[in-house]
Amino acid sequence: MSGKDRLPIFPSRGAQMLMKARLAGAQKGHGLLKKKADALQMRFRLILGKIIETKTLMGDVMKEAAFSLAEAKFTSGDINQVVLQNVTKAQIKIRTKKDNVAGVTLPVFESYQDGSDTYELAGLARGGQQLAKLKKNYQSAVKLLVELASLQTSFVTLDEVIKITNRRVNAIEHVIIPRIDRTLAYIISELDELEREEFYRLKKIQDKKREARIKADAKKAELLQQGIDVRQQANILDEGDDDVLF
C-alpha cells in the first residue's frame, strides 16, 4: 500500500480510534448529503415540470394578450401616447420571499397591485370592453412572467447546488471513505505486526532465561558431584537484573 492511498499517520491504538471516529463521521456525512441531494432532486424535478407547464401556458396567454391589443387599437385607435403621457407609477410591483429547501435558500417572486386601478373607467366611450380585456390579459401575462422568472431562478440555483452536493457525495464515497478504510487497515496490520514482534521478543527472553537456568543447574550439579558446597554461593539468576531486550 503506497503512502498516497492512505493518510499519513503513525500506527497506534489512539490513531486506530481516531480513524474509526473519522470513518463513522464520513459515513454519517455521506448519508446526510445523500438525503439532501435526493430532496433537492425532487424539488428540481417539480420545478422543471412547473417551468414546462408555465411556458406552455405563457404562449397561449401572450397570444391572447397580443390579440387583445390589436382589438383595442382597432376600436380605440393608438392608445400608446395616451398611456405614456398619463402614467405616474407602476401599479403592478414585485416582492420577494425566501423558500428553504434542505438548507438551500431559493428566492420567490410575487406580483401584486399597488393601489387601485387609476384607469379603470378609461376608454368606456370607445372600446371600453376591449381595453378592460387588454388590461386583464396583460396582467395575467405579467403574473406568469414573474412566476416563470421565480421558477427559472430557483431552477438555476438548485442545479448549481445539486452539482456541488453530488461532487461532495462522490468525493466522500470514492475518495475519503476508501482512504480512511485503507489507513485503518494499515494501522491494524502494523499493530498486529508489532504484537507479533513483541510476542517473539518475550519468547526469546524466556528461552534465554530457561537456557541460562539449565546451564546453572548443570554447573551446580557438577560442583556437587565434585564435593563443592554451592548453597552459600551467589546465584546470578537470583539477582534483580533487568531483562535483556533483543
From Swiss-Prot:
Q: Which Gene3D superfamilies match?
A: 1.10.287.3240
* Source organism superkingdom: Eukaryota
Q: Does the keyword Flavoprotein apply?
A: no
Q: Which InterPro entries match?
A: V_ATPase_D
Which Pfam families does this one have? ATP-synt_D (PF01813)
Any one GO MF term held by the record is: proton-transporting ATPase activity, rotational mechanism
* Cellular component aspect of the GO annotation: plasma membrane proton-transporting V-type ATPase complex; proton-transporting V-type ATPase complex; vacuolar proton-transporting V-type ATPase, V1 domain
**GO BP: any one term:** proton transmembrane transport
Q: Does the keyword Membrane apply?
A: no
Keywords of the record: Hydrogen ion transport, Ion transport, Transport
Annotated disulfide bonds: none
Question: So what family is this one in?
Answer: Belongs to the V-ATPase D subunit family.
- Quaternary form? V-ATPase is a heteromultimeric enzyme made up of two complexes: the ATP-hydrolytic V1 complex and the proton translocation V0 complex. The V1 complex consists of three catalytic AB heterodimers that form a heterohexamer, three peripheral stalks each consisting of EG heterodimers, one central rotor including subunits D and F, and the regulatory subunits C and H. The proton translocation complex V0 consists of the proton transport subunit a, a ring of proteolipid subunits c9c'', rotary subunit d, subunits e and f, and the accessory subunits VhaAC45 and ATP6AP2.
PANTHER family in the cross-refs: V-TYPE ATP SYNTHASE SUBUNIT D
Known function: Subunit of the V1 complex of vacuolar(H+)-ATPase (V-ATPase), a multisubunit enzyme composed of a peripheral complex (V1) that hydrolyzes ATP and a membrane integral complex (V0) that translocates protons. V-ATPase is responsible for acidifying and maintaining the pH of intracellular compartments and in some cell types, is targeted to the plasma membrane, where it is responsible for acidifying the extracellular environment.
Under which name does UniProt file this protein? V-type proton ATPase subunit D 1
What species was this sequence derived from? Drosophila melanogaster (Fruit fly)
